[in-house]
Regions:
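An extracytoplasmic/periplasmic, membrane-proximal ligand-sensing/linker region
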Residues: 25-67, 71-72, 76, 261, ...
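A ligand-binding cleft/hinge motif common to bilobed small-molecule-binding domains
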Residues: 122-132, 186-192, 215-218, 222-243
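Short helices/loops that flank or line small-molecule/ion binding pockets
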Residues: 104-118, 131, 165, 209-229
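Bilobed "Venus flytrap"/periplasmic-binding protein-like clamshell domains
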Residues: 65-88, 123, 143-213, 221, ...
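Short beta-strand->loop
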Residues: 135-146, 201-202, 236-253
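Bacterial N-terminal signal peptides
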Residues: 9-17
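Extracytoplasmic small-molecule ligand-binding "clamshell" domains
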Residues: 42-126
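Short helix-initiation/N-cap motifs at beta->coil->alpha
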Residues: 97-108, 197-214, 253
Length: 359
């Protein structure tokens, strides 16, 4: 199956070369709420309306799908292959995987019309809705209900950190500025518990939940707030061992990643894709890789993402273009730093053999 791999910084470069302008629909729109000027929300359901003009509806011969890069993006190309093969048969349209390296790149890919279906992580879902015309329609889950997750703050099992108060003066990994569980929720909840990020402890952006978990495991960070579903999947795959960690705090549940459609797909095609998702049952390997989930449940953005928007409101982090541009720059800078670190690590053995690590 063909994969597309955009270069690091793709979102920032593309935004610089392609201004975001209001569409004809935007100019005639009576209400758009929090949506960008390119979209309209006259029915006030908080997501972009289907364009009124038939000429603006899309019916692509190939459907392009991407999943949020909360872990190594290459993992998902394999995990979602059965779904894409099924969608190819179910919709009658070839469906391919588009590998993205950042949340910003994924949002911009849908905004620019090159992405038709996407799984967005919890926080960036709101950016995708407001800025890219994404319409969430499904959440993965099990036989009883859709999946939720908690923010868990993890430390090494052998650490002397026992409570959030012990994080004062420490080095704590947050994932990225737009992440609900990896940044916004801790900033909303921790001050009420006597701990203020950036003031009481140093925030270091790791670039992803898996990187935060691995960094705590390696001793690079003293603690990290991460999404419980990612943490548990990493344990299930054997990437880390549960007994090497302790959870010192957890939140109430949040919805997990959304699956969304581009707002301007031909309505008959959009409905067909929705029904294909709802009818699908995950094969065994996919169930195992995705935490035991076996199906997709209908999602309603206005209802199910209300707790996420409340967290963003609490920390004055609006899901608008200014915030998105700032996060895009941060993601690019963080990726550049990680690339430099990798280059330094690759060059280090040539200068001097590394000392054996004492366990």
């Amino acid at each position: 199956m063909k994969k597309f791999a955009p270069a690091a910084g793709f979102a920032v470069a593309l935004m610089a070369s392609m201004p975001w302008t209001a569409s004809a629909q935007g100019a005639a729109c009576g209400f758009r709420g929090s949506l960008d000027d390119a979209y309209c929300d006259e029915n006030r359901d908080m997501v972009a309306d289907v364009p009124r003009e038939a000429s603006r509806l899309r019916d692509p011969s190939t459907l392009v799908f991407a999943y949020t890069p909360v872990e190594d993006p290459a993992l998902y190309a394999s995990q979602f292959r059965p779904l894409l093969e099924y969608l190819t048969t179910c919709t009658g349209k070839r469906t391919v995987y588009f590998q993205v390296t950042s949340n910003a790149a994924q949002v911009e890919a849908m905004r620019s019309g090159r992405l038709h279906i996407a799984g967005f992580s919890t926080g960036p879902t709101a950016f995708a809705v407001n800025l890219a015309g994404a319409v969430p329609f499904a959440i993965k889950g099990g036989p009883e209900s859709f999946e939720s997750y908690r923010v868990v703050t993890i430390v090494r099992a052998d650490s002397n950190i026992q409570t959030l108060a012990d994080l004062k003066g420490r080095r704590v990994a947050h994932t990225s500025a737009t992440s609900n569980s990896g940044n916004l929720a801790p900033r909303a909840f921790f001050p009420g518990l006597g701990l203020t990020p950036d003031t009481d402890y140093r925030v270091v952006y790791s670039g992803g939940h898996d990187r935060s978990v691995m960094g705590v495991n390696a001793g690079d960070y003293d603690a990290a707030p991460v999404a419980s579903d990612v943490y548990n999947r990493m344990i299930g795959r054997g990437q880390v061992r549960r007994e090497n960690f302790r959870v010192i705090w957890e939140s109430d549940p949040f919805p997990t990643s959304s699956f969304a459609l581009a707002h301007d797909l031909r309505p008959e095609l959009a409905q067909r894709i929705r029904q294909c998702f709802y009818d699908y049952r995950f094969p065994e390997a996919m169930r195992r890789d995705l935490g035991g989930n076996d199906r997709f449940w209908p999602a309603n953005y206005a209802e199910h993402w209300a707790p996420v928007r409340a967290v963003a409101d609490a920390v004055n982090a609006p899901y608008n273009r200014a915030a998105f541009d700032a996060e895009s720059r941060r993601e690019l800078e963080a990726e550049q730093r990680r690339n430099q670190q990798r280059q330094q690590q690759q060059q280090a053995p040539a200068a001097a053999p590394a000392a054996p690590r004492v366990q």
